[in-house]
Amino acid sequence: MRFSLCGFPLVFSFTLLSVFDTSLSATTISLTPEDSFHGDSQNAERSYNVQAGDVYSLTGDVSISNVDNSALNKACFNVTSGSVTFAGNHHGLYFNNISSGTTKEGAVLCCQDPQATARFSGFSTLSFIQSPGDIKEQGCLYSKNALMLLNNYVVRFEQNQSKTKGGAISGANVTIVGNYDSVSFYQNAATFGGAIHSSGPLQIAVNQAEIRFAQNTAKNGSGGALYSDGDIDIDQNAYVLFRENEALTTAIGKGGAVCCLPTSGSSTPVPIVTFSDNKQLVFERNHSIMGGGAIYARKLSISSGGPTLFINNISYANSQNLGGAIAIDTGGEISLSAEKGTITFQGNRTSLPFLNGIHLLQNAKFLKLQARNGYSIEFYDPITSEADGSTQLNINGDPKNKEYTGTILFSGEKSLANDPRDFKSTIPQNVNLSAGYLVIKEGAEVTVSKFTQSPGSHLVLDLGTKLIASKEDIAITGLAIDIDSLSSSSTAAVIKANTANKQISVTDSIELISPTGNAYEDLRMRNSQTFPLLSLEPGAGGSVTVTAGDFLPVSPHYGFQGNWKLAWTGTGNKVGEFFWDKINYKPRPEKEGNLVPNILWGNAVDVRSLMQVQETHASSLQTDRGLWIDGIGNFFHVSASEDNIRYRHNSGGYVLSVNNEITPKHYTSMAFSQLFSRDKDYAVSNNEYRMYLGSYLYQYTTSLGNIFRYASRNPNVNVGILSRRFLQNPLMIFHFLCAYGHATNDMKTDYANFPMVKNSWRNNCWAIECGGSMPLLVFENGRLFQGAIPFMKLQLVYAYQGDFKETTADGRRFSNGSLTSISVPLGIRFEKLALSQDVLYDFSFSYIPDIFRKDPSCEAALVISGDSWLVPAAHVSRHAFVGSGTGRYHFNDYTELLCRGSIECRPHARNYNINCGSKFRF
């Protein structure tokens, strides 16, 4: 049966079928919670004689357990003729420990009419546990014709057993469709089909939650979970899982999870197993003894609707490769199509133990092997074959005008034993690569009867891999060699014709590709040299034709830059020698090292923040002798732009300072600080540094008149401001401030494809500031502020970065670098003193132009080759606007509390500063 691509019509049609088929002449029998039955040693029999067309309708949850009908030789629900329907009405039906005797098929349900149908629909929970639990009995649900599980929520079959077929379900036509919650088959056992056996079609479709078959067993037979003599269709489900199912009977057990073979001697068409459009499909750790650790079938079609995985399945066939994951029976065929997800074969093996994904028995073949754009079919386990054919296989063929340009991958990278058999795949067919990519990696070998390519397709070979034609010619029109494999192999890729007098032709240019970009970071590329990358080996008496150009195009990349040139040597076998002419080096962004000079910006921010703390202390309510203890934090962020990569500097620490007002005109203070910083470039580098800082402040207070008298050398000159609002002879405050900081850096660079690198070096930072301000009383009792203090400063900051080098083989050397900045902050501060004179707050606005600046930069070079490049720091604008605010509280005569915050804004950069502290007078 084939289903609509839309789930609704399918579920709706089955619902209508259920209603109309049972409503014409049916008797509705209500099952209430009072009908629940729990047998004991005195009363263990419970059997319903079902009449044709009966409908059992639940009005509440019903539980039936501990039933033994052995003496009656009947199922719990025995149907001799006609159909039966169980309608859940969103209630639960539970069966536990049901027995019907060893000669009766179906302990819970036996429907014996070859034209009838048994249906279960609309249940909130449908549970069958150990019904029966004895392998000598004959399964849980049996229908001689059709059996359907439709539109239920939770469905559970656990530990049901049968000595014949289908431990959970046995029927001629089994349908599990449209269920809304999980459907699970766990630890069921039978001879054929540990969970389900169908002598005709088996459909599992449009289920909206997990379909799980786990630890089911085929004892003395095949199909650990499913066995069918008819078609198996598993389509459009949300998630299908087959895990740890097994068929391990010696000389019999095939298909650890699924087995589908035609009835011996039958003239009916060969049944097909179809997996289509399932959002996720997983076969994991299923086991068989005679082939097909997961699936054994004559005809198999898998079309992915999402990730499709065959993982760690095993076929225990001694001394034979009979399909660790899949075995295709004699004369059979297999189609694999990655439509909406990648299909992966990994860790599947035989008992020898050799990796083995798919095995083709005699005359079996691939019908389709194709992947849509963006998806792939990945064989980390080889394909083996007993066939010796020459039928045509068009990889990524396009029979229905669909675009198949994805990747078919054969790789030996998952082999742990490094046995040659883990790497060799055989497809005994004439293969044409119609479109997309055929990729052979990590030592894998692929043998076909004949190989050709259509224009626009790509054959990609690693070094050390082989493409072999066992019977016919090889004609290649689009060849690429993956030079990322230079790091793992020095053996040339081989293209070989095994049969005498056969030809190998290579036309169009040969590409050298590096998908990861790491090939040009290989240290061997630092020198010009020749690499033998390709060997063409025709059969005895055969010939090689090469029309590829001598110069190979090089796509833009990072790492060592240069050109490739190709030359061929040899007469019979030809070896392609690729000459690499190295020119220079271009570092990838994460290797440029921009964080190193950027740290100088962080040093400057930290030193300036200490200077600002001392300036703030000088405006204290109590300027006499005291000790300040402050906590300080800086948050400097440069956002990404056309000129910058992102940079962040966060630091925090403490400040200890002492101050003293020597005279009313002379004030001085000294400070010590320790800061802990984290810097990052948002790429691969992070730095931590510890910075020790010291600073000294001297402040001198005079008046405007004194300045003019001194300048004019006339003590009788009187100068002031002509305004009622201001003092006629305002004060002038001048200060000198210097600071020094020493930082020890520890940087980690965590590359995506290379080991982590650690570096250490030291930075130093000096700063000098001279400035003046003029306090003016603007409002005696202003609501917002009372005083205005215009100020102007001249500030010099110089930061120096020491040189250092990395100790790794491909390490970098960084030269010293520096930052120099001369700025002139201009602004005004407004102050407000509370009536109690215990609280003072101020806020200020300033503009800071950098009148001279030398941005930080340094030179980086590869130690091993000497190739160098300039490493610039982030470009920070020369113009900044700063807003700040400070609050002070005179707690008592000996203690003052302070909190200050500021924000400095530049285009693409922000700096936030906060400090809180307390002064103790002594």
From Swiss-Prot:
Membrane-topology descriptor: Peripheral membrane protein
Gene Ontology CC terms, in alphabetical order: cell outer membrane; extracellular region
Subcellular location: Secreted, Cell wall; Cell outer membrane
Superkingdom per UniProt: Bacteria
Keyword annotations of the record: Cell outer membrane, Cell wall, Membrane, Secreted, Signal, Transmembrane, Transmembrane beta strand
Classification via SMART domains: Autotransporter
A Pfam family per the record: ChlamPMP_M
Coiled coil: none
Family designation: Belongs to the PMP outer membrane protein family.
Protein name: Probable outer membrane protein pmp1
Name of encoding gene: pmp1
